[in-house]
Regions:
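Glycine- and acidic-residue-biased ligand/ion/polar-headgroup-sensing regions
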Residues: 68-100, 108-109
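Short, surface-exposed beta-strand-loop junctions and turns on beta-sheet-rich folds
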Residues: 102-104, 129-130
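Residue-level marker of beta-strand positions
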Residues: 93, 111-113, 133
Length: 146
């Protein structure tokens, strides 16, 4: 348990509620179960000369999913009626162009949100000499919250 070294309103270190923390731990999550269920095992969904699309599966209890795209030129995406949270994790910069003509530039390490209402958009690598690697997170289609 960690309190991120934040200070309370009185300027002193905040006390930890150990019992509350213990109630939020899953002690059955250990050993082989961790390897099988909690550690992400990425796999390639699509690979061709234009791009590689990888799925980075999340735990079944997580409400979000993650894909990783690697490409040199451009890639077209559909929102499928959900927002996308994207981050450029490799490369220089991209230009995002929505189907209605809106354009926005993003640089390496920047995070941006594409609203579901955008419907479709194109991600254009501004420096095709360097590949772009982009991570996209979105809410799973069927979510069951506990």
């Amino acid at each position: 348990m960690y309190d991120w070294i934040r200070m309370g309103l009185d300027g002193k270190p905040r006390p930890l509620n150990i019992q509350h923390g213990m109630n939020n731990l899953y002690f059955e999550r250990k050993g082989e179960k961790v390897i099988q269920e909690l550690i992400c095992h990425p796999y390639i969904m699509k690979e061709n000369q234009e791009c590689t699309i990888e799925h980075l599966p999340t735990h079944k209890e997580h409400f979000y999913d993650v894909y990783r795209y690697t490409f040199k030129d451009r890639i077209q995406m559909n929102t499928e009626n959900t927002c996308h949270v994207c981050m450029i994790v490799e490369g220089d910069s991209v230009c995002i162009e929505t189907e209605d003509g809106m354009k926005q530039r993003f640089n390496y390490a920047e995070t941006f949100v594409i609203p579901a209402a955008a419907r479709s958009y194109t991600i254009i690598n501004e420096n095709p000499d360097k590949r772009i690697m982009l991570v996209k997170a979105f809410v799973k289609k069927e979510v069951t919250l506990k």
